[in-house]
């Protein structure tokens, strides 16, 4: 990840990368530009490959649009790592904008960890279950 190794780049492109994060992990229903949790269906516990509903606003028949676990955990882990790295980039600054971005980065990390934890937890449980 470029942000981890080039902090100047990370600061210059924070808002641009934040747009990508908001596209898949936006927690705010007040955001007029991106849907809330584009792929994550918290009720069913799945991530959907093309979003929660079809272009016509209908659910996908037979749930045939479920995201593969490997794709979703990689996307959500990337969100968590980005938040962690950017919190490091902005930590220690006395600048108001940097403090604001530090708090945003912490929330990004929290969102990514929450999103990542949902599909990975059952995987770890099944893997450790040796009865069968």
For each feature predicted by the language model, list its residue ranges.
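Core of folded catalytic or high-affinity ligand/protein-binding domains
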Residues: 1, 33-40, 45, 63-67, ...
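Well-ordered alpha-helical scaffold segments within catalytic/enzyme domains
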Residues: 1-8, 63, 71-89, 96-104
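Short, glycine/acidic-rich beta->alpha junctions
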Residues: 16, 60, 74
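Long, well-ordered core segments of solenoidal/helical folds
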Residues: 13-57, 94-97, 114-131
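Active-site capping/gating regions of soluble enzymes
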Residues: 63, 74, 80, 84-85, ...
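Soluble or luminal CAZymes and related metallo-dependent hydrolases
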Residues: 16, 71, 111
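Hydrophobic transmembrane alpha-helix bundles
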Residues: 52-53, 58, 65, 76-80
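Short, solvent-exposed segments of well-ordered alpha helices
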Residues: 11, 59-69, 110
